[in-house]
Design a protein with these regions (language model features):
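Hydrophobic anchor residue at the start of the ABC signature
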Residues: 138
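Conserved ABC ATPase "signature" region
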Residues: 95, 99, 105-120
Length: 233
């Protein structure tokens, strides 16, 4: 089973997502790259059921997100760690997520240790740095022990030590058999962890293949600029 997007289209004033198709299989990290405004976040929102595509399908293990019987056990996500309600403590936020998703709250202390936030368990979210909120967002994404992760710019706000920690954790999660879709503008980090890469520019997929295929063009950075649509150059 896998995440499969087929012919996904969406249109807004001045922007069009056109026939986006790619797959994320279990046990692999797929880097999702593109310039600002290229359609990355819109694609992820459609995948997670936050928007409906005008055409095409976005399926997780054969079903759209809205029809998953246990969504948080199937896919975890980070879209924007800054939105997390600031009035709650770290533990209260994860407890709320667990109750909402019908999940076991006993995993919360273990996850806080895993993301190195146990020391901040009683701290209000409003007092967390962006990097700490990213760690909290990851704990929330892992709360249901999901088979897939969808991560949108999860490295924002992390210091160099935090980025290295996150890189190692992603590899561990992949080696446990999880499929991971990683959207990031930090090309060096995508290059360090991705098995495959999907590039999107001006609303359409401009390249898709193994990391080694793209690096054969010189480097992932070279390939990124080579695959930009004329509008984004």
């Amino acid at each position: 089973m896998s995440i499969v997007l087929t012919g996904v289209c969406q249109a807004y004033s001045g922007f069009e997502l056109r026939d986006v198709s790619f797959e994320v299989s279990a046990g692999e990290i797929v880097g999702f790259l593109g310039p600002n405004g290229s359609g990355k976040s819109t694609t992820l929102r459609i995948l997670l059921g936050l928007e409906r595509p005008a055409r095409g399908t976005a399926l997780i293990e054969g079903a759209p997100y809205a029809r998953l019987s246990e969504p948080m056990r199937t896919v975890g996500s980070i879209l924007d760690a800054q939105w997390i309600a600031g009035g709650q403590t770290v533990t209260q936020y994860l407890t709320w997520l667990a109750i909402a998703g019908g999940l076991d709250r006993s995993r919360i202390p273990v996850l806080l240790e895993q993301v190195d936030l146990a020391y901040a368990a009683k701290r209000r979210v409003s007092r967390l740095s962006l990097g700490m909120r990213q760690r909290l967002g990851l704990a929330g994404a892992l709360l249901g022990d999901p088979r897939y992760l969808v991560l949108d710019e999860p490295l924002n706000g992390l210091d160099p030590e935090g980025i290295r920690w996150f890189r190692d954790l992603l590899r561990q999660l992949r080696d446990q058999g999880r499929g991971i879709l990683l959207s990031s503008h930090i090309l060096s980090e995508v290059s360090a962890v991705a098995d495959r890469v999907v590039m999107i520019s001006d609303g359409r997929v401009t390249g898709s293949g193994s990391l080694s295929d793209f690096e054969a063009e010189g480097s992932l950075e070279d390939a990124f600029f080579k695959h930009l649509a004329p509008k984004d150059r």
